[in-house]
Structures are given as structure tokens and as C-alpha cells.
Amino acid sequence: GSEMTQIEKVVDNYDGLGTIKVVKKDPVVYPNFSKTYTDEEIQSNDIIVVNETNGKSKLVSQSDMLVSEMDYQTMSQKVTTLDAEGQITAAIQSVTSANATTLYYTSGHSEQELDSTFKDVLNKSNIDTKELATESAESVPDDCNILLINGPQYDFTEAEYNVLSSYLKEGGKAMFFLYPTTTEKMTYFYKLLSDYGVNVADGYIIDSKGSYSSQYPMYLTPTMEDSDLTKDVTDTQKVVIPICKGMTVQSDVRSTLTVENMMSTTDSAYAKTNIKSQTVDKEDGDINGPFSVALSIKDSYAEKTKGTGHATEIVVFGSVSFETSTFLETNQFGNRTVLLNSLSYLAGQETTTLAIPTRSLQQESVQIQESDRIFFTVLLVVIIPLILLGSGLFIWIKRRKN
């Protein structure tokens, strides 16, 4: 089909780039060719990426490159996006990289499951994932390069806190996502952050001046601050965070600690402390902003005993909804860019790992913010017609006088 032609075009574009050479083999004519590189069954349009220098190889199957979704009108699977370039580039990076990065994600506290698109970003960034049941763990495994705490809805125990705190104190790297609407006391989880100069505000943020839609003031489009992790977000992109907790930086932090604001609300923001309230209007007990919604933390204390490069590094986002498929699967939003930069930072990657988004095979509509939609509606429906009417009236009156 047309998808197969598009895959072939993508593959042909790699031929001759640097030392890359494309060789096409018919699996019917050469049935045993693939056994040198993989034990898996090979089908037409599958791709094997081979590094002839170190012997590493990786299979990219046709099914990996064609992304399907359920068409509820026909109740059948329909190919919607092409992921050939992303999968092939990730495979090239995998077979040419010296070491893989291992990410451990905690479990046992109703953490958010890793979204399919988040998994895809990790896979394309050559980051392996493993589960860490902190309830039974005596320590964080030695091969953990990044610790992910992905929106827990229930708190950690004191014993779990001690395990995680020890890991961080020894120069660990971590990424935290908060669950904004939990009603549980998160004493030990939030203590992991307060140990590094960050306080978490109660409730979730309402910011009518910094929202994606005037109808949903809890859907934030935060301000990008001066940070290496947000600098690649373009002017045409928006980072969107639906329902988010606010954070503030403690005024007096130790000399080894640096806390950098990545994204923030406007001054008009406030935290809705009663998450069961039926109104988004400000009420008694709500907390005035502004707030940080994403922070990067670096503590150089561990470098005193373990040497350069062993600083504690944490990136924390105010909401687990930051990483959902809607905002990660295209470059239309800046969420993917910030997430990739954050992962690269924590992994200590000297060069940015490319995680190319999928290419839609369907026509995509242009997303316009609510405020822009209202502006253009007024401009086209009211202002321009009034200008034309006024101009016509002026010409008519002038001619009448003449």
C-alpha cells in the first residue's frame, strides 16, 4: 500500500548519509539472512539496523512503524500515523551508543501508568525501563540512572522515604510528577521535595490569564522561564498542563543547592484548596500565586565525597497530565521538547538524543487558543465589516456633497 511506499522513501533517504548504507534483501529469496542479527521472524518491510563495527543490531518491524487506532465508525483498526523515521533513527542511536540508560519507576502508590506515547519517547531515547516496588526495596538498584515517581496518589512510608532519600543524597537523578487532585496527605513524598528547597501548595492552580481556554482556567499555558530545559520550545509551540499543582521555592536554601524555575503561572493565579468545590472562582482559603509548575534542582553536596558529576539532580513537574499522549505525540505542543530535554539532562547525555514524533497520514486541524479564536472572530465578523461599512458610508456622503 501507500504506507509501504512511504517507508521505502524514508529508508532511501538514509542511504549515503555518513557511513550509512542501505541493502535490500527479499526474505523469500534470502530466508536465513536475518538469523545472523535476530531470532525474530522477519516479514516484508521489516528493517534490521546493523553496526558492523561493534556487531550491535536492532530489528525495526513494519508494525513498529505503522501506528493504528480504532475507527469507531467502522469498528476496525486504521493506520493513522507513520513512525518510520523515528523508529529507524532510534535504532541507529541504539546500536551506536556506548551505554543504555536505565529508568526505574516506583509502584505501589497508585502511580500513573506510563502513557504509550511516554513509553515511545523513552524507547526512542534509548532508555530502558524497570519497575521498583519501593515497599519491599532496601535500596534503589545500582543500575538506576533515573528514578521516576509518576504521580502517586498515596504517600510513601517512612521506610520508603529513607530508601529514596538515601539514593538522592548519594547523587541520584530523579524525575517527579505530582498528582494534582489527590485528597491524601503526601507527607513523605513532599518531604523528598522540601529536602531540596521546594514546597508544594495545596490544591490545584486556577489561572485565567495563563490558560489554554477561557472556559477551562485550570488548563495552563505556563510562561517559559530562562532555563536550558525549556529554551528549545519555539514561539509557535505551547506547553499545556491540564490541572496542575503549584510549587514555591524556599527563601533560604543551603549553599550547595540550586533550584531553577522552568515554567511559571501569571501573577493572577491562585491555588484552589478545596478540590471538591463546584466553582473555579476564588474562595476563602485559596492561596495566591504566582507559582512554579516545573523546576530543576541540583545539589552538589554529593560531589564533595564522590567527585565531579555525582551531583543530585531532580526535575519536577506539577502535574502527571503533562506527559499525556495528546501533548506528546506531535510537535504542535512544547511538552515533548521539555520532556526530552529533561530526560537528556538527567541521563547526562552530552548530545541530544533525537526522539522524532510520528508523522500523521491524515489531515490535521490547526489548534487555536480560545483567546485567539475570539479575537479573530471579532475581527472578521465585527471589526472588518464595520470598517468596510464606514468606508462605504464615507464615500457615499462625500459623493452626495459633490
Q: Across the structure, where does each feature detected by a protein language model lie?
A:
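Short, surface-exposed patches at the edges or C-terminal ends of soluble domains, predominantly
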Residues: 1-402
